[in-house]
């Protein structure tokens, strides 16, 4: 494997995620969900605009020789800010992949670094790269102007939810311990397998995008129950399970709910699945 393959897998992960359908509360080819300003074509444009960014991440990872891997993260974080602007230019200001710019950029960098250090597992590389991330990012939030806080910062202050920063700093345990095993167990078409993997993620995670939309952390208990029901109905390989997803999407549209955090974790899962031939 080389960096070109890693970048290819990153782009495929973004494109696979938007193609999977029907996804409740998310954009797919059949529905924009609660995102009237988005469509699948916009996600394709957004994904392809990020190719130079992933190439830069991979190049940084494979060339990095210093012992302190937090320096590698600092390198790509600056590149990521530029990539966000490229994405916004491609989508005319719509936030399609900002979460993936961070999370998938980290994984692409770690996977490229691993090419030179095959004895170190991916999660360990990520944890070492991101050591101290939440402490650094959330330090002194109480002294900041509340109007300048991001949604993630507000949720941390209000509910103590660390969100994607906490997930990333821990080496993406939801991906490694929940989503990838679910993908390995899954059967059927790629679409069926990825739907079941998505709902396994939904069942296990605190989706900060959903909390943001609902303005209530208790919505997480509700969505976990919905994911349980989906699997009780037979999941993606049953007519009842698929009908339930379509009904659930309408509920999400009616309440303006989104599962953007879960979608980002699915992207990471697809990427690793392609890297490891779980998705052939």
Curated annotation (Swiss-Prot):
<dbReference type="InterPro" id="IPR002736">
    <property type="entry name" value="CitG"/>
</dbReference>
<keyword id="KW-0067">ATP-binding</keyword>
<dbReference type="GO" id="GO:0046917">
    <property type="term" value="F:triphosphoribosyl-dephospho-CoA synthase activity"/>
</dbReference>
<comment type="similarity">
    <text>Belongs to the CitG/MdcB family.</text>
</comment>
<keyword id="KW-0808">Transferase</keyword>
<dbReference type="GO" id="GO:0005524">
    <property type="term" value="F:ATP binding"/>
</dbReference>
<keyword id="KW-0547">Nucleotide-binding</keyword>
<dbReference type="InterPro" id="IPR017551">
    <property type="entry name" value="TriPribosyl-deP-CoA_syn_CitG"/>
</dbReference>
<protein>
    <recommendedName>
        <fullName>Probable 2-(5''-triphosphoribosyl)-3'-dephosphocoenzyme-A synthase</fullName>
        <ecNumber>2.4.2.52</ecNumber>
    </recommendedName>
</protein>
<dbReference type="Pfam" id="PF01874">
    <property type="entry name" value="CitG"/>
</dbReference>
<dbReference type="GO" id="GO:0051191">
    <property type="term" value="P:prosthetic group biosynthetic process"/>
</dbReference>
């Amino acid at each position: 494997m080389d960096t070109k393959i890693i970048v290819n897998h990153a782009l495929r992960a973004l494109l696979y995620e938007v193609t999977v359908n029907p996804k409740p509360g998310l954009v797919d080819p059949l529905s924009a969900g609660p995102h009237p300003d988005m469509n699948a074509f916009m996600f394709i444009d957004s994904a392809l605009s990020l190719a130079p960014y992933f190439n830069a991440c991979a190049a940084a990872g494979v060339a990095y020789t210093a012992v302190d891997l937090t320096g590698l993260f600092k390198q790509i974080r600056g590149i990521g800010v530029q990539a966000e602007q490229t994405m916004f230019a491609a989508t005319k200001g719509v936030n399609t992949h900002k979460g993936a710019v961070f999370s998938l950029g980290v994984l692409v960098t770690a996977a490229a670094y691993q090419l030179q250090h095959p004895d170190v597992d991916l999660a360990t590389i990520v944890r070492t790269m991101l050591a101290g991330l939440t402490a650094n990012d959330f330090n002194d939030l109480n002294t900041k102007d509340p109007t300048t806080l991001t949604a993630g910062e507000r949720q941390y202050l209000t509910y103590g939810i660390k969100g994607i920063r906490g997930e990333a700093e821990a080496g993406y345990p939801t991906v490694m311990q929940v989503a990838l095993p679910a993908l390995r167990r899954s059967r059927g078409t790629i679409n069926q397998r990825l739907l079941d993997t998505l709902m396994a993620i939904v069942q296990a995670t605190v989706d900060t995008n959903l909390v943001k939309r609902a303005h209530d952390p208790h919505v997480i208990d509700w969505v976990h129950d919905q994911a349980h029901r989906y699997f009780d109905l037979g999941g993606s390989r049953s007519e009842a399970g698929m009908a339930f997803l379509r009904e659930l999407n309408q509920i999400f549209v009616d309440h303006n709910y989104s599962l953007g955090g879960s979608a980002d974790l699915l992207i990471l899962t697809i990427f690793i699945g392609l890297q490891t031939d779980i998705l052939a």
